């Protein structure tokens, strides 16, 4: 399943998200959700331990000036990669 997270980690329940995740799932941080991909974020380690792949949209990272702060555990992707993730997953959930 593809989970798109568009809200700040401080505005949504990441404890619930981490309980839903399984290996093979992908999480894409978009909009203010890219804040969850910052190195040292308290929510990031819980998401990493779930085994899901983590992605963040490059344009949203750049728009917030976070280019050098994204964890190396989060793969930065562009809109073409975003489309490829949506094609890969028949089921999607937006947070």
Swiss-Prot record:
Its main location: cytoplasm. One of its GO terms (biological process) is tRNA wobble position uridine thiolation. Heterohexamer, formed by a dimer of trimers. The hexameric TusBCD complex contains 2 copies each of TusB, TusC and TusD. The TusBCD complex interacts with TusE. Part of a sulfur-relay system required for 2-thiolation of 5-methylaminomethyl-2-thiouridine (mnm(5)s(2)U) at tRNA wobble positions. Keywords: Cytoplasm, tRNA processing. This is Protein TusB. The keyword Transferase does not apply. InterPro entries: DsrEFH-like, Sulphur_relay_TusB, Sulphur_relay_TusB/DsrH. Belongs to the DsrH/TusB family. Pfam families: DsrH (PF04077). It is found in: Cytoplasm. The keyword tRNA processing applies. One of its GO terms (cellular component) is sulfurtransferase complex.
């Amino acid at each position: 399943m593809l989970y798109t997270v568009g809200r700040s980690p401080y505005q949504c329940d990441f404890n619930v998200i981490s309980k839903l995740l399984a290996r093979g799932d992908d999480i894409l941080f978009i909009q203010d959700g890219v804040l969850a991909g910052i190195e040292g974020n308290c929510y990031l380690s819980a998401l990493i331990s779930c085994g899901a792949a983590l992605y963040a949209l490059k344009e949203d990272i750049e728009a917030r000036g976070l280019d050098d702060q994204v964890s190396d555990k989060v793969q930065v992707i562009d809109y073409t990669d975003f489309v490829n993730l949506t094609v890969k997953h028949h089921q999607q959930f937006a947070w």
